[in-house]
């Protein structure tokens, strides 16, 4: 029997519903249950693929090529289960599907309405494909009271009535703000949030209360009384030092036991959380530290690089060091010397991005790393700019550039117009739509057997996730390799460069894919493990 748990949020946004959902999934997994995580996003975009990273944050790409919410990254990292396009849906996607069906005549002339057509589509999505799972955790994006979320709340209310008794539960994540002048945590915002939820027809079974200090017993009693939940169902979600402490913290508070009790399941043993304790101990007690510069375009919102931050943390865990991040806006290097910003750092990472803004700054960062022998990791756009830099500085091609920025006589990086997905040829044109038109999802690559990157991976066959429209031009391979920039990884057909490395450099690697999307705390990605390892070596030389 599959049981459904719906996670909603109240009072304010950005409370961490995704982390809470992932942590609960990890706790249930640690008890031996099979868990699926899904995300309902109320915004009208079809997917986050064309949304600004500084507004929405990272776009998390799945193996099957879906551009999804960053919370799916939390789901994967905490559970180790790869997400798919079937785990995330938006209002925009639902409306697009409904309108397409209406235009096709599928509704036989019926008047299309939010109830039942939109709510039915949401329910169908929630219930589809859950065979074999013990629990399905469904996170509803946004905050209770948001007008965009009303169809989703109505849909999960209906599911509470339609599913057999004992198969559905609701968790409400809320905030208990501390008022210094009063010297106490305030429960009134939570009471109002629950009242709003109940006015929709949803009675939460568990309150997960974010706070920065212990909740006094009297406040727990007040919340239980006014929000109509058991006192044991008022769960303290106190701030912790690391997100990898969240499952341990929620486990100590009994969140998983309370969920099992809701479904009439007796918790006969404790969850097996030893590996989480090991990760927590390594994060809290590093044996050293390194400093890494991230030269990016969206540094104003760290969520734009969420998976990258976590992958670097995983590399630190593997090397037992703390990773300190120095955020540098790439545009700064277009008007200032990079040296004062980068001196004394142990590694430079240039992440993905789109557009000309900051491109020359990233090129200068790559040159500094190459010339000063500092470990350099270029991801997607960061690889492309490293190749442009090498073409200009090493191969004697001063006009080398990317066609992404306009016409150029030396298109070292150009628009990717066709590529193979399995046995099928995919094509794109420059004039096409932006949404969903990139090389997306998991693709295989072949690494040169004697390359550094093959040594790091421990093999020559890899599969990594991509998200890009532009690709390094193979026509420049011979000239670049003659100057020490090796094309060490190619697509299976040998037509697309996937990895490059600078020979004779301590650690200079560029990859066209996004390895950060596949890194896990218990299985750090080999490239991040190696990069941080190289930074540790560099730290001993400074």
Swiss-Prot record:
Mg(2+) binds at residues 71, 139. It catalyses: UTP + L-glutamine + ATP + H2O = CTP + L-glutamate + ADP + phosphate + 2 H(+); L-glutamine + H2O = L-glutamate + NH4(+); UTP + NH4(+) + ATP = CTP + ADP + phosphate + 2 H(+). Allosterically activated by GTP, when glutamine is the substrate; GTP has no effect on the reaction when ammonia is the substrate. The allosteric effector GTP functions by stabilizing the protein conformation that binds the tetrahedral intermediate(s) formed during glutamine hydrolysis. Inhibited by the product CTP, via allosteric rather than competitive inhibition. UTP binds at residues 13, 186-191, 222. The active site is at 380 (nucleophile), 514, 516. L-glutamine binds at residues 353, 381-384, 404, 469. Its EC number is 6.3.4.2. Belongs to the CTP synthase family. This is CTP synthase. The lineage of its organism: Bacteria, Pseudomonadati, Pseudomonadota, Alphaproteobacteria, Hyphomicrobiales. The gene is pyrG.
């Amino acid at each position: 029997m599959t049981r459904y748990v719906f996670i909603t949020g109240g009072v304010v946004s950005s409370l961490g519903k995704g982390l809470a959902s992932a942590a609960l999934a990890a706790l249930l997994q640690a008890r031996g249950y099979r868990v699926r995580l899904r995300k309902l996003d109320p915004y009208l975009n079809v997917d986050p693929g064309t949304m600004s990273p500084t507004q929405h944050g990272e776009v998390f790409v799945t193996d099957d090529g879906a551009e999804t919410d960053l919370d799916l990254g939390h789901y994967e990292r905490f559970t180790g289960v790869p997400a798919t396009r079937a785990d995330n849906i938006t209002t925009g996607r639902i409306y697009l599907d409904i309108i397409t069906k209406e235009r096709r005549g599928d509704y036989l002339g019926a008047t299309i309405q939010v109830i039942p057509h939109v709510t039915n589509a949401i329910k169908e999505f929630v219930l589809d494909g859950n065979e074999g799972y013990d629990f399905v955790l469904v996170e509803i994006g946004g905050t209770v009271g948001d007008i965009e979320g009303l169809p989703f709340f109505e849909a999960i209310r209906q599911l509470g009535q339609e599913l057999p008794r004992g198969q559905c539960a609701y968790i409400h994540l809320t905030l208990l703000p501390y008022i210094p002048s009063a010297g106490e945590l305030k429960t009134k915002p939570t009471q109002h949030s629950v009242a709003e939820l109940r006015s929709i027809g949803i009675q939460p079974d568990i309150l997960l209360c974010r706070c920065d200090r212990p909740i006094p017993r009297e406040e727990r009693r007040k919340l239980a009384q006014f929000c109509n939940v058991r006192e044991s169902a008022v769960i303290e979600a106190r701030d912790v030092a690391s997100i990898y402490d969240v499952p341990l913290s929620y486990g100590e508070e009994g969140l998983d036991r309370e969920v099992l009790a809701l479904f009439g399941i007796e918790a006969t043993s404790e969850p097996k959380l030893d590996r989480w304790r090991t990760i927590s101990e390594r994060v809290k007690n590093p044996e050293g530290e390194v400093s890494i510069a991230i030269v990016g375009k969206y540094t104003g919102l760290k969520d734009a690089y969420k998976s990258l931050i976590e992958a670097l943390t995983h590399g630190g865990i593997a090397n037992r060091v703390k990773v300190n991040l120095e955020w540098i806006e790439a545009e700064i290097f277009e008007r200032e010397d990079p040296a004062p910003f980068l001196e004394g750092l142990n590694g430079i990472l240039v992440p993905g991005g789109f557009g000309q803004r900051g491109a020359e700054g990233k090129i200068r960062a790559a040159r500094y790393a190459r010339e000063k022998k500092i470990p350099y990791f270029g991801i997607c756009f960061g690889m492309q700019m490293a190749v442009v830099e090498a073409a200009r500085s090493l191969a004697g091609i001063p006009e080398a550039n990317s066609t992404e920025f306009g016409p150029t006589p030396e298109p070292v990086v150009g628009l990717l117009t066709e590529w193979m997905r399995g046995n099928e040829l995919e094509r794109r044109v420059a004039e096409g739509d932006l949404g969903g038109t990139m090389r997306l999802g998991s693709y295989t690559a072949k690494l040169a057997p004697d390359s550094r990157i093959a040594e790091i991976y421990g093999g020559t066959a890899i599969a990594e996730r991509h998200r890009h429209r532009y690709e390094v031009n193979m026509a420049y391979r011979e000239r670049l390799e003659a100057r020490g920039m090796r094309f060490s990884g190619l697509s299976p057909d040998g037509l697309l460069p996937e990895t490059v490395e600078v020979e004779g450099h301590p650690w200079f690697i560029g990859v066209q894919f996004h390895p950060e999307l596949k890194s896990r705390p218990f299985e750090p990605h080999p490239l991040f493990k190696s990069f941080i390892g190289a930074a540790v070596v560099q730290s001993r030389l400074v």
